Design a protein with these regions (language model features):
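A short acidic (Asp/Glu
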Residues: 43-49, 108-118, 147
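Acidic, metal-coordinating catalytic cores used for nucleic-acid/nucleotide bond scission
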Residues: 102-112, 139-140
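Long hydrophobic segments that form regular secondary structure
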Residues: 27-42, 55, 192-195, 202
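Nucleic-acid-processing active sites and adjacent nucleic-acid-binding tracks
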Residues: 23-24, 42-45, 52-103
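Beta-sheet entry/capping signal
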Residues: 29-32, 48-50, 59-63, 98-101, ...
Length: 229
């Protein structure tokens, strides 16, 4: 059973209140993407890599894919399946109306540069003109603002999420850490193998969504939602 600690970023009741597993995101709905990648290893187990979507019209967050090492001895030799990540990004642009994509380029800068070259011109929202996707996570103030806005939207019930196990687990794993600019997120002190990468990906997708709204992108719903086969 998942529980939450005193320094948890979110509680189970707060997440449960916005859970909407039956929401269907259509091909025509403008969405934003957030990507947090990893190649590092923590105590012989690699961090996760996550790709999360956010519908611009209502802020609905949904898991596209989270790649994590399996439990047990096989985790020792596990590596992030780069081909699967590339395929998931490509499929997202084919299957959804992607208007913005913010990605943490750390250790994935070559991939992010390739995605910018392939899809950058199609985006309505850009982090910068030269690097439309590469979100500068070294800008602590921007990260703090991103998590503050996301948490407020969740706690106030302004958005929803798909209730997927990876997103739920990563959200509840996140712990608050005070810095000069505000609050950033970290792993639990007593469980450094716990993953929070999807929480960062969700923040990036939500930040892109806010920037899209600021530009008037995706504010009108179009079409009837339909499943993607």
């Amino acid at each position: 059973q998942i529980t939450h600690a005193a320094d948890a970023w979110l509680s189970q009741p707060e997440l449960k209140a916005i859970e909407k597993p039956d929401v269907v995101v259509s091909r025509s709905d403008p969405i934003t993407l957030g990507f947090d990648g990893s190649r590092g290893r923590s105590k012989k187990k690699p961090d996760a890599t996550a790709l999360v979507g956010c519908r611009v019209s209502d802020g609905h967050l949904f898991n596209i894919h989270v790649w994590e090492a399996p439990e047990g001895p096989s985790a020792k030799d596990w590596r992030i399946p780069e081909a699967e990540v590339e395929s998931a990004v490509r499929d997202s642009f084919q299957n959804y109306n992607v208007v913005g994509f913010y990605a943490d380029p750390a250790m994935w800068d070559g991939h992010v540069a390739q995605w910018e070259a392939a899809y950058g011109r199609s985006l309505k929202v850009a982090y910068t003109r030269d690097k439309p996707m590469a979100f500068n996570t070294r800008s602590i103030s921007r990260v703090v603002a991103g998590f503050e806005a996301l948490r407020a939207a969740i706690v106030d019930g302004e958005i929803s999420y798909d209730g997927s196990f990876p997103l739920t687990r990563h959200f509840l794993n996140a712990r608050r850490q005070s810095v000069r600019s505000g609050i950033v997120l970290r792993k639990p002190n007593d469980n450094y193998l716990a993953k929070i990468d999807a929480t960062y990906a969700a923040m990036l997708a939500f930040s892109a969504r806010l920037d899209a709204l600021g530009k008037g992108v995706g504010t009108a719903r179009s079409g009837v939602p339909r499943r993607i086969y």
